[in-house]
């Protein structure tokens, strides 16, 4: 026989919610540990009264009855594990794992049976449903009915609020069945009532969350917080953990209670109660128990009279009544000589306490992180000149908690603690000591060179130099391209009477200044390349544009399908049968009806006839009866469009008188869009004439202006004839 069985993915029922966790069965105990809260529940072998198996949706589970009447249900077992688990229970616990039969008829009348702390509603000896009475918060009786109210679980998306039982009156019965039912429920229900004498009362205790001063009354099964505005009744079994932590200045003490389920104040939930005490405040209380009760009920852990600091007295009473040990700060001692590490979490400052099995942050908001929840931790630097760092904790569920503004002096102690607990550090390389020594080894020596900061400065310097170079080049390019009076100078050269003055200015500007001659030539080359690129892109865009095809109205209409013929015929009937139907949904509805239609021969014959009609008309259309084919029409239209879109440049020159320029006035940087073609035809040698050649040409133009005009017109006529011949 195996010593134990362990299952990592088992769900336990907790107030209507299946909480995941780990289940371990040994020959001494059945242990379940909740993954979310870390709460551990143990069932001793001596306390087990009955073990059954029960079928659930898609799986099966265990029902464990204890001798005290409590019912524990665990689900999530595979079918293959049934035989193995049954054999282990028989050998280890001497129990037969019998299957529990359930009634699935759906009836709402039957017999109510009380078995321990469970109300079972049966029909024909089969259980319809079960109600753990520990989930009942209140029981109210009526004339012939009983109403049960239940505790709510915040993790449950849907919860049962109340249930009513109708109990018919029986004349022969001596006892009232309604009253008897009520007594059976209340004897096992978890009803919080402040009746009876309280065990201890602590007055005006300062609580940080929820904020205020409260009187704390402790009863045997719950404790009550009574404030000026709010009152809370908290069951003892809802307390998960107790923490007693000293303040960093050692002048105050924190007493923290972890709650599940949390208490509510409006829409705010408080998972932790944080009580604040002064160490010098003392109190003396006397418990209302006899010596025999203290010895038998509490095993001598409490004395009849308790005295000392308030936090010690309250902690001792809570520890015994709740049955949980108080967790202290552990062995960690920070740079300040205390267990608290000052830091900021979210928007508030507080203290981080490294514990033996986790971290706890106090106080706004309080947070407890167990080591088994942590995936990795990370030490993040806040900057080379700052004297603090950030501590990042990444959980296995992906959540990241960042504790910032921690003093660098705390790094060595915190790092040693983490390595001792064997937590994974995400930003640690192979050389752990190197990171420790370089980043935080000597926090006082701020004059050591920072390689990271130096690299950032170098990159910023390079970027500034690149930006300066880019600005210079941009300024040069804008100066070259910017010509506000370019169009005005063109008009002046064409139509002004004093043309020689403008040309002389241009020649003086081009020829003057011997130092800038080389710069001017390079600029002209740069402009020529730009103009050539612009002309190429303009021509390419013209080539890309394609004429749109016009729809041929004479082309025959395609044949209609059988479905469309049927839909056109039944469209009105669909609208009548479905008033308010959308236009887009008519086709969808018709498709469903078409699939269900069995006899489609009528519409298929009509579709075939329409198809034959289309083929005949298309044959006549292509042969020429219905007009030319679409391709032929498209071809002719393309040809005509091409001729229209490509007029000869000579015609354009003749029609516009402003487009003419004599050769001596044409320069590469003063060409308009109309005479770009002419600029290309002029040889470059003539464009690179010196100032002397320009003077000679200007004198010749005065005397031979008429001859040059005739010659240019003749050359243009020759060019026009050549273009027409090429077309």
UniProtKB/Swiss-Prot annotation:
Cellular localisation: Nucleus; Chromosome; Nucleus, Nucleolus
Gene Ontology biological process terms from the UniProt entry: DNA repair; DNA replication; regulation of chromatin organization
GO molecular function annotations of the record: DNA binding; histone binding; nucleosome binding; RNA binding
Biased composition (Acidic residues): 464-479, 487-508, 704-727
Region (Disordered): 458-565, 596-727
SMART domains documented for this protein: HMG, Rtt106
PROSITE patterns, alphabetized: HMG_BOX_2
Function: Component of the FACT complex, a general chromatin factor that acts to reorganize nucleosomes. The FACT complex is involved in multiple processes that require DNA as a template such as mRNA elongation, DNA replication and DNA repair. During transcription elongation the FACT complex acts as a histone chaperone that both destabilizes and restores nucleosomal structure.
Name the record gives this protein: FACT complex subunit Ssrp1
UniProt organism field: Drosophila pseudoobscura pseudoobscura (Fruit fly)
Upper lineage: Eukaryota, Metazoa, Ecdysozoa, Arthropoda, Hexapoda
